[in-house]
Amino acid sequence: MTDDTLIGRGEKRARELESFFLDPEMGHIFDISGGDLANTVLGHLDLEQIKDSQAVFYGYSDLTTILTALAKNGNQAVNFQLRNCLVNKDLLKSGYFDRLLAGKEKNKELDELEVTFVRGSKMAGPVYGATSAAC
């Protein structure tokens, strides 16, 4: 894409995303487009306007810039790629994913996850992410 084709796209996408958050019927927002242009959206997103939305935003990879901003804003943001449901058909067949979206399945906190340590028995230290400086 040339710079000419990108002009205004971030603002347009930000307005569209805001409209999803402002729709009281919207429960879940899945971005399946990828996040190549996520940084162009971030500067135009009116976080104050959408802060009270109950909609949950799901994204992955480059979209972590938006996930981080939404989470810091008090919105629900999940680092998840919908394509995982195509790869792991058990998520759909078991009904787990449907129950989770319907609010009938409890989300597990990080300290509730079942993990096996390959080396040692605990983790300690700061957590760093690729987008920690984005917001």
Positions of the model-derived regions?
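Short beta-strand elements in bilobed, periplasmic/extracellular small-molecule ligand-binding domains
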Residues: 1-4
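Active-site histidine-anchored catalytic micro-motif
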Residues: 6-126, 130-131
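Short acidic-hydrophobic catalytic motif
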Residues: 134
